[in-house]
Amino acid sequence: MKDKLVKAIAKDGQVRIIGAITTELVNEGVKLHNCAPTAAAALGRMLTAGALMGTTLKSGKDTLTLQIHGGGIAKGVVVTSYADGHVKGYIGNPTADIDPNSKGKLDVSGIIGKNGNLLVIRDMGLKEPYIGQVPIYTGEIGEDLAYYYTVSEQTPSAVGLGVLVDKDLSIKSAGGFIIQMMPGADEMLADLISYRLEEIPSITEMISKGMTIEEILEYIFEDMDLKILESIAPEYRCDCSREKVERAFASIGQKDLKEIYDEGKEEELKCHFCNKAYAFSHDEVGDILESYYSEK
């Protein structure tokens, strides 16, 4: 089934919903980083969350970056997303893997850790990006994002994220949703939705059964006048380039660049998001030094 993201409303706009199937997207990211099962689940949940949240950006030039650092062996997860649904990300330690939790599920919170923060960074081309930050609530990512929305943006929200890793380490199913109550929404409606979310199967189970994202949302919001407003094809896509990597290389500073140049060696840099390698010869390091740091 092709990945798909939809935006919707229910109950005459009292509820705002973003839902997506992200199996192919997550599979791409997990393969690029050669993730162990628990690391794959953590990265996959973050990629799915990024795809969902990125579509709330107003401009194609805006970016949304999610970071979670909890002191665990995952060594943090970083995801950057865009308004068109494309997303990229990495996990600090792709080999992070521990025994399943008490429910027999991949122990994402166990590798993320709980001693740290979740950050949401919106860069809208202004002088400074907007940074929202909350302490990690559980380390399961979905609950942490729901906590972020409630505390930092004062928007009561339910966030469901799921990644099912197959025996061959491929992604069998992945997806998620963000459900938000709009100002003035009926409190009994919020209670009803909470009850339904407790009763439904997991999103990965529904995707594995072949349900589309529209069918999943219709199932959750039965008799609530669900209206699909927009659909997008989310994808994993890195936009790195030699020029961007060169700028990042130059930013290490004149002193460090001079040391690298004086050693006379070729320098290789890898993109965090896609692992593509960029080699800079001794002469090219010299050119960067001259271009960025020579006195005009």
UniProtKB/Swiss-Prot annotation:
GO molecular function: protein folding chaperone; unfolded protein binding
Keywords, ordered alphabetically: Chaperone, Cytoplasm, Disulfide bond, Redox-active center, Zinc
A biological process term (GO) from this entry: protein refolding
GO cellular component, one term: cytoplasm
Pfam families: HSP33
InterPro entries: Heat_shock_Hsp33, Heat_shock_Hsp33_C, Heat_shock_Hsp33_N
Signal sequence coordinates: none
Primary localization class, coarse: cytoplasm
Family to which the UniProt record says this protein belongs: Belongs to the HSP33 family.
The protein's name in its UniProt record: 33 kDa chaperonin
Species this protein is from: Clostridium botulinum (strain Loch Maree / Type A3)
Encoding gene (name): hslO
